[in-house]
Amino acid sequence: MKTRTQQIEALQQEWTQSRWEGIRRPYSAEEVVKLRGSVNPECTLAQLGAAKIWRLLNGESKKGYVNSLGALTGGQALQQAKAGIEAVYLSGWQVAADANLAASMYPDQSLYPANSVPAVVERINNTYRRADQIQWSSGIEPGDP
């Protein structure tokens, strides 16, 4: 676990990255760390996904743009990734119509349960994690063809 000073320094360093260029904060890194508490849960999948889409949108895309397809299931998302699709899109209207936790069809007006989209994201992430476990146990490194 990092000390308070290490956390402050790490956050200050993070804020110097180009991703945060132009962002004005009326608070200091010290104030943020003070409010966090000593235990900071990590959201690894969210952090990895955010970093990947940031890199793609800022020049790492193979084609100079980022194409995407909608996926409603983990199987669809996994097949898209295997086919080379760089990003997966989860549509709110699709969740409203087909995958909300109330098991009913709704218009895309956020009338469905608020945890429906996070539940679909969790299922997609679980599929990706399982595929990663299978590849890793076979000796395949991330990014290998």
Describe every region a protein language model picked out.
Residues 96-100:
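Short acidic/His/Gly/Ser-rich catalytic and metal-binding motifs that mark active-site loops
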Residues 4, 46, 50, 73, ...:
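Generic structural signal for well-ordered, non-membrane alpha-helical segments
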Residues 4-70, 81, 136-145:
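N-terminal amphipathic alpha-helix/helix-capping segment at the start of soluble metabolic enzymes
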Residues 72-94:
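Catalytic domains of carbohydrate-active enzymes, especially glycoside hydrolases
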Residues 64-67, 85-88, 122-125:
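Structural motif
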Residues 94, 104-145:
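Active-site beta->alpha loop and helix N-cap motifs at the rims of alpha/beta catalytic domains
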